[in-house]
Amino acid sequence: MKVIKVENQVQGGKVAFEILKEKLANGAQTLGLATGSSPLEFYKEIVESDLDFSNLTSVNLDEYVGLDGDNPQSYRYFMQENLFNQKPFKESFLPRGVKDNAEAEVERYNQILADHPVDLQILGIGRNGHIGFNEPGTPFDSQTHLVELDQSTIEANARFFAKIEDVPTQAISMGIKNILDAKSIILFAYGESKAEAIAGTVSGPVTENLPASSLQNHPDVTIIADAEALSLLEK
């Protein structure tokens, strides 16, 4: 596991983009993508580059259950606004946030992941150490599944909604096994609120109580983080 300290998210996006260019030069075809504020500067680097992504495939980590793709709070909408509209991919897959028959959607998405092995997976991290929407207690051998969101996750995401009651309580998420199947992983972490989770991810015990600690079992993980997120690790 490699840890790169950056001044801010802008620098973090540039560092990640250099890693991406190296992976693409070595034949990467499929990118695993994440939402949230952490990867935004990385996506900006992609959009502003002259690289052609029209032969690449993307698969996203997760999607809320109950939000249509046209809903501004859906992750499909987020990806369209921040990346896909400006930099089209050959194919872009996201879980469908269907309320009915979620089991069929889980099966469909696991097949997509089997058909499109991820070369580089992008991650953020939750305050409780979740990656994707894999909350504490998620088995490390889990594949795509329906998730009941932790209250801390709902509270953290409430800032994106008019009121906390509007935040979906369920999501469909890649499982930890799906994430670890990626050849390479970049995890972004910014701010003091992520410090405890990062300390456990890098140097704590590998435990299902901290989903991101599973990354210690992966051979090629790069953590890009600022001083605040690394503050407990450096003490």
UniProtKB/Swiss-Prot annotation:
Domain of life: Bacteria
Cellular component, GO, one term: cytoplasm
UniProt KW keywords: Carbohydrate metabolism, Hydrolase
GO biological processes: carbohydrate metabolic process; glucosamine catabolic process; N-acetylglucosamine catabolic process; N-acetylneuraminate catabolic process
EC number of the protein: 3.5.99.6
Pathway: Amino-sugar metabolism; N-acetylneuraminate degradation; D-fructose 6-phosphate from N-acetylneuraminate: step 5/5
A Pfam family reported for this protein in Swiss-Prot or TrEMBL: Glucosamine_iso
Catalytic reaction(s) noted: alpha-D-glucosamine 6-phosphate + H2O = beta-D-fructose 6-phosphate + NH4(+)
Transcription regulation recorded as keyword: no
GO molecular function, one term: glucosamine-6-phosphate deaminase activity
Annotated catalytic residues: 62 (proton acceptor), 128 (for ring-opening step), 130 (proton acceptor), 135 (for ring-opening step)
Family in the record: Belongs to the glucosamine/galactosamine-6-phosphate isomerase family. NagB subfamily.
Function: Catalyzes the reversible isomerization-deamination of glucosamine 6-phosphate (GlcN6P) to form fructose 6-phosphate (Fru6P) and ammonium ion.
PANTHER family listed in its UniProt record: GLUCOSAMINE-6-PHOSPHATE ISOMERASE
Protein name per the record: Glucosamine-6-phosphate deaminase
Species for this entry: Streptococcus pneumoniae (strain Hungary19A-6)
